[in-house]
């Protein structure tokens, strides 16, 4: 009986010690989970590389997320810990998991994402659809080296010629075979909107003269048919395919607004007649800078452009992002 009592006592003591050991170990894990993140000061720019990455107000994964970052969003990082980056957002501090942010080079756009649109208008239809542009275009990422090689074979039908037609008494007269087209500058306090026009050149392959226009804060180009004098206004001169069968016109918007483009089929060059195929708004990327000859057709028939993901168009300082990607666009006949 004494032996039985002794065994029971020993089992009780062993069980208590084991329970206390497990409890202490559990308490140790809890302490580790609540460990304070220690941040080391840094100064660098990173980008969100995960769609739906969580934006933390405090560096604690157990805190319920209030909002999310957008893919490609630039971050100005001011601190780094074991698990988090500390970011400056205006006058506030935000935190993102280290695995969700990296250098610009880690950003990727798939062909499906490049060909995605917010809307597509076919011809002159008013009802739009959404979806892929793959029926009309093939768009793919390329290397900078391929882009630079293609620019050596750039095709440009625009001939700069500013002397053929010049203004006289603020009036620019474009003499065509069947008409004289006049543009008058309107500049002064009495006019609600200033207007200014300059002859800048011609596109012989389409039998067009080209006039640049500034109306208020808006800029554009006007083509004038050399024979009839018919005018067509563009936000930017269209890019002409090497086989002269298509026109590709891009309308770029500042900051984070999506870019639009229109694809035309050339039905006649004399007189110049074109048919609108589609107008679309791009979903995921923007042209880097259309004014610096970053967009061009090459002899192989592809349109080349330098771009940025739409959320990376501006850097963390709100300035035009100097980093960029490169694409080529093929027109499906």
Region annotations inferred by a language model:
Residues 26-84, 120-130, 175-189:
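Beta-loop motif signature
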Residues 23-39, 88-138:
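Boundary regions of SH3-family modules and the immediately adjacent low-complexity/disordered segments
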Residues 211-216, 249-255, 260-262, 305-311:
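Beta-strand C-termini and the immediately following turn/loop, strongest in propeller blades
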Residues 166, 200-206, 238-250, 294-303:
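Blade-terminus and WD-like Trp-Asp/Gly-His loop motifs, strongest in beta-propeller folds
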Residues 170-190, 215-233, 262-282, 316-333:
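Surface-exposed loop/turn elements that mediate protein-protein interactions on large endomembrane-trafficking
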Residues 1-14:
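Sec-dependent bacterial lipoprotein signal peptides
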Residues 17-20:
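Bacterial signal peptide processing site
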Residues 109-213:
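Terminal domain-start segments
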